[in-house]
Each structure stands twice: as C-alpha cells, then as structure tokens.
Regions:
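Non-catalytic, usually N-terminal nucleic-acid engagement modules in DNA/RNA processing proteins
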Residues: 2-216, 445-483, 496, 501-515, ...
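A structural motif corresponding to the C-terminal end of an alpha-helix
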Residues: 122-133, 163, 167-176, 203-223, ...
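A cross-family glycoside hydrolase active-site/sugar-binding cleft signature
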Residues: 37-40, 73-79, 136-140, 178-179, ...
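A short, charged/proline- and glycine-enriched loop
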Residues: 34, 219-221, 484-490
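Glycine-rich phosphate/ribose-binding loops and adjacent secondary-structure elements
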Residues: 2-3, 30, 214-374
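A polyanion-binding, active-site-adjacent surface
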Residues: 487-490, 494-574, 578-581
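Gly/Ser/Thr/Ala-enriched C-terminal appendages of enzymes
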Residues: 321-442, 563
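Glycine/proline-rich loop-helix segments at beta-alpha junctions forming the active-site rim
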Residues: 556-646
Length: 646
C-alpha cells in the first residue's frame, strides 16, 4: 500500500476538567480517536520482514495486524541496535517503509517466504486485506539516558537530529518525535538542568524548521516536540521557553504537538508525574491565551492506572511497553470486574484456567482459551525451540505464551482507554478519576496524583501502618521462587524506609538511571536479608520498620548469610552481579556476601564516605551506569576487585 504521509490532529471536544476527545488522521483515509494508547513494540528484530524474528514480538505483530487489524503502533527507531550488528541489515529494512513491510505480511500462501519467515508457521495459509497503520516513530532518546556514549555511526549515521529524521522518514513515520535527552531522577543544580533541557529544546526547534521546509508531496508527519522537567516549575518553564521560541521561528507548519518525556524514571511517584504533566499543560494553556492549546499532547511511557488522571490534565496520546514486560514475567492482569481493587492486580499463568479466559473474553483470551493448559506446560520447557505439548494439535514455542499474556494485558489497557473516553463524553471524568484513585490498591499514590492534578486535598487515613510483631523470620523467599527469565543482571540495593522499596526516592533514582530491562533488583533488608522486587509488596515487607546498624553484629551476620545463600542458590541465573551500597552496615553485608560467593562487583568502588548521602552522588551513579553497560566486558574488573579484597 503506497501512500503519502500527511498526518493531522483535530480537537473535537474539551470538557471543563481539561480532558479532550480528538481525531488523528493519517495516510489516505486512516483515523484514530483520542485519547489513544500506542503499543510500543520492536519491529526490526533481525532480517526483514515485519512478521519474522523477534521472539514474542513476531507473534504479537502477526496477531495484532492479521487478526485484530490494529491500526496504531509506536516503535523507538534505534531499537535495531539491539538486534542487528551491521549496516547491511539496516539497509535492507530501509528499502521500504514499515507500511509496505506490513502489507507484505498480510499476504497468504508462500510468497516471499524468506522475507516473512512463513515456513512452518501455522497461520499463513490465509491472505488478509492490507490496511493503513499509523506508525509513531520515537527518536530513541531514552537510550541516551543510561548511555551517553551511545552511537549509531557504525550503521552509517551520526547520532544527531538530521540522521534521526532521515531514519524516521525512510521508515515511513506518520508521527515522529524530536531527538531528546531524558532527565535521570537525580538532584540537578539549576545550571546543569537548563543545559540538559536546552539540548532537547534546540533539537525540537531544528525538527520543526526542517519539516517546515518540505514542499509538494514530501512527507508531512505529525511532529511531537519533546519537553522535559523534573517538577512542575521546571516543566512549566521549559514549555514556556519552547513556545516563545516557536513564536519567533515564524514557521507555517501546523501539524505539531508536545511529548512529555522523563516520566518513566519517575512513574512510581504518581504525584510527581501528575505535577510535571500539569506544568506542561498549564504552560500551553497560559501562553498567548491558549494559542497552542489545540495541539496534541503525548506522555511517553505512561499507561495503566495513571491514564485517567493524565487524560484529565489534557494528555491525548500515550504509549506503553509494560504489557510486554508483564507478559514476559508470566503475569496476567485481571479484568476490572474480577477484582474490587484495581486493574493492576495480576495472577501468574499457573493460576489461570479456561474459565478465567472465558470470563475475560478479550481477543487474546478467545484465541488462546483452548490452549491455556498446554501453555502452562510450555513455560517450563526450553526457550527458542518448538515443542509438542499435550493438549495442542500443533507445535508450540515458548514465545507464544509470552505473546498471549502480553496481548491480553494490552487488551486490559485498551478497555481502560475506552472507559475514559466514555466518561469524557458524559462529562464525568473528574468523579471517575477520584473514585478510581480511592479504590486503587496503590497505597495513596493515585490520591496524590489526583491532588496534584486538581489542587484538591482528599481526606485519607494517617500514614503507613507498621507492625511491631514482625521478626526476621516473618518473611522468607519461597522454595518455589525463581528469578524472572530475561533478567540476567542482578543489582543488589539497600532497603529504604519507604515501602514498597520501589516507591522510595533513592530506589526510583537508581532504577531510572539504569533502565535496562535485564536488571533484576533484589533489596537487602536489614531485617530479612534479600527481597526480590517481585516480593516487595508482601505484607511482611511492607509493614516492618528496621534499619541495620554496624553495631548489630549478630543481625549483620544473619543478613550476610541470607544474601550469600541467595547468591549460591540463584547466582547462576545471572550473567553479571553488582551491589550498589553506600551505607556502612549494608556495605559490610554486601562485601562479605560477594566475597563468600566468589564473584560480583561492589559499587561505588571508592565512596568518599560510607553514608547514605553518597547514594545519589552523580559520580557514584555514573560508575554504576558504566558498570552495567556491558556486563560481560566487566568480568575481568570483577575478578580484579575480588582479588584485591581477599
């Protein structure tokens, strides 16, 4: 399907609360109603074409295109660096835009078998009619967050805005985003923050000017200009500066909007995320009496329980890859009617039955309802091989189980979007958001987001409950526990006062600074020893209050023993092990446990002092980032450090 790229956004309705309904028009006749959630997927997962390679992604793409006819995806264009090693492979992809590659996947029979990987695949005997898809091509700036040395020069492209636009154009982007530099969740002085923001701001202006120069039938995508801030004030200031510069540019190109970045590293702090988004949308509404207020607004990486609140603030589009990550962890999000808590409650695949899938009734559950028992057996088998599984008439590969769970989880997200649209149409979204926050099981986090969005204070019970009856034997890792597949980097962190640990500012900062999906965080509790991130919300972990001190020698020995036991039991699951600890008591535990196990890297390597204030020092966080960039390349460094400590 050859087509012109000419994408526009039209605001159809805006409620008193600020929530909006709109339409994105793309291609020849394509339409997408907003608010909309773009599934973030990887497309270039090896040699062409669209339905070939990529483990679970190939099944997701095949089902969502050939069966669902889903018409909007986001992909971060630099993801090819994770799957390809040569310029030649990339050049093969760039011969055609993504729309053409997708059209070829829709054909039936044995045409282009090599390109589409159809040999031996059960569902390619039928042809499906091609249709238009809206491809949102993100610049890939998030890769720069954890690796400032990232480069695509070996593929023939300098890492600069001009190259990014060239790639987005060749790939056929209907929506494109400017090359940006996300802000890690660290403490910035004003000068450093503005310098980082200005790099993104200048790239946004460059992109707008570059597309404004296009003429005739040259592609005219909808442009999202990236905006960044670390709180309300800095987000508001950045947005206002960007708008003033756009005014001075005097460009005539009108198909642009604003994409809010740097939210993913802060997403566990829902109130902060809402404040940052409000800073952006307030600045847009205030500038020149709302001159740009009909432009679309995107929130990068936001989905799930935050969507209702952010829609109320005026966000039109979202994207998410969390449905894939939840699926890879073999988790199934329960439909809202199956729980009185929130849409975030999950079950493991082992807990599912045909009745569970039948009650859900989503497209994924309908497709795989008869295969749930074989899939439960399949996840225990070897990866990357086809298996004959009892109960299935055809061979199965483990990636299909991941794909099924991922697509079901995405369907739950889509249902929430549709519910939000209905509430906007009825002018009842504000009440819905408050009810949603109050019934959520997120321990007040969504209440804080609602308060940040509206300025209203919501009464709620005092503080976090602490149990005085918990002992060090109140929590243990179950014998059935296994570290999640695909996470082959172990990162040990010290515990925090705030629970769950992932909600603590210190943990948020480190998780944001090392967003590699392969990192498995295990927290060293001063009371319990190792606590894997999947078990952080166990009641015994949420409600204890104990800080390990160097003087508690017997407890220090017990915690050390438990951490050592964890390493000996599960250490072979990881290709790289590191402990990032600055406090003296927890550093003693980490050092002794790593030494007893025989490998692992203790960071920071030489802190100025052994106190918690060193935890977020820029130099120390940067050392951690560098250590995790290439775990295998760090092997000699690990061995050297251990040898020195013996």
């Amino acid at each position: 399907m050859s087509r012109n790229v000419n994408t526009t956004f039209t605001l159809e309705k805006e409620s008193a609360s600020g929530a909006r309904l709109g339409t994105i028009q793309f291609g020849e006749r394509g339409k997408l109603q907003t608010p909309a959630l773009f599934p973030a997927i990887c497309i270039m997962t090896g040699p062409p074409g669209f339905g070939r390679q990529g483990s679970h992604y190939k099944y997701i793409k095949r089902a969502m295109c050939r069966d669902w006819r889903h018409n909007h995806f986001l992909t971060e264009i630099l993801h090819f660096t994770d799957y390809m090693a040569t310029k030649r492979s990339l050049d093969c992809w760039l011969k055609k835009p993504f729309q053409t590659w997708m059209d070829e996947m829709m054909r039936g029979g044995n045409v282009d078998t090599l390109d589409q990987g159809r040999m031996g695949d059960f569902d390619y005997e039928r042809a499906e009619k091609p249709y238009e898809n809206c491809f949102f091509l993100d610049s890939g700036g998030f890769k720069l967050l954890s690796n400032s040395d990232f480069s695509i020069e070996k593929f023939g492209y300098p890492t600069e805005p001009k190259s990014i636009l060239e790639l987005q154009t060749k790939m056929g982007g209907d929506i494109i985003a400017s090359l940006d530099y996300p802000l890690a969740p660290l403490a910035y002085d004003t000068k450093s923050l503005v310098q980082l923001q200005n790099k993104s701001l200048e790239n946004a202006l460059w992109l707008l000017k570059a597309v404004d120069k296009r003429k005739g039938k040259e592609p005219k995508p909808l442009i999202y200009l990236a905006v960044h801030g670390v709180d309300y004030e800095t987000a508001h200031d950045y947005t206002d500066r960007l708008l003033q510069k756009i005014d001075r540019l005097g460009t005539k190109y009108s198909a642009f909007g604003f994409a809010i970045g740097s939210l993913v590293p802060r997403r566990t702090n829902r109130g902060l995320v809402a404040s940052i988004v409000k800073g952006v949308t307030d600045a847009i509404r205030e500038h020149r009496n709302g001159f740009y207020s009909q432009k679309p607004v995107h929130a990068f990486g936001m989905s799930g329980d935050l969507i209702p609140t952010l829609v109320m603030l005026g966000v039109d589009t979202f994207d998410t890859n969390s449905f894939v990550q939840t699926g890879k962890n073999l988790k199934y999000i329960l439909p809202a009617r199956a729980t009185d808590k929130s849409v975030r409650e999950t079950r493991s695949i082992d807990e599912l039955s045909a009745d569970t899938l039948r009650m859900c009734g989503c497209r994924a559950c309908k497709s795989y309802g008869s295969l749930i028992e074989p899939l439960k057996r399949l996840v225990r088998l070897e990866r990357d091989k086809r298996h004959q599984v009892e109960g299935s008439a055809r061979d199965l590969i483990k990636s299909e189980a991941y794909a099924f769970l991922s697509m079901h989880n995405l369907e739950i997200e889509f249902r929430e979007i549709e519910r939000v649209k209905a509430e906007i149409a009825k002018n009842t979204l504000n009440r819905y958001v408050l009810d949603y926050a109050q019934r959520s099981n997120n321990r007040g986090n969504l209440i804080r987001a609602y308060e940040a969005a509206t300025g209203q204070i919501v009464p709620r019970p005092d503080g976090r409950r602490v149990s005085l009856n918990l002992t060090r034997d109140s929590f243990t890792i179950p014998d059935s526990y296994r570290p999640p597949e695909g996470k082959d980097i172990l990162l040990l962190l010290p515990c925090s006062k705030d629970k769950p640990y992932k909600s603590a500012r210190s943990h948020q900062a480190i998780r944001g600074a090392v967003p590699d999906l392969r990192v498995h965080v295990v927290t060293i509790s001063g009371l319990y020893g190792p606590v894997p991130e999947e078990l952080e919300e166990q009641p015994e972990v949420l409600f204890y209050d104990y800080v390990l001190s160097p003087e508690a020698k017997e407890q220090t020995e017990e915690v050390t023993r438990r951490v050592t036991d964890y390493l000996r039991r599960y250490g072979t699951n990881y290709k790289f092990i590191a402990a990032y600890v600055t406090g003296r008591a927890y550093r003693i535990v980490a050092k002794r446990a790593l030494k007893a196990y025989g490998k692992g890297l203790l960071l920071p390597s030489d802190p100025k002092e052994q106190t918690s204030k060193e935890f977020l020092r820029y130099e120390n966080v940067r050392e951690l980032q560098q250590a995790l960039l290439s775990p295998i390349a760090q092997k000699h460094r690990q061995d050297a450090q251990l040898a020195l400590s013996m």
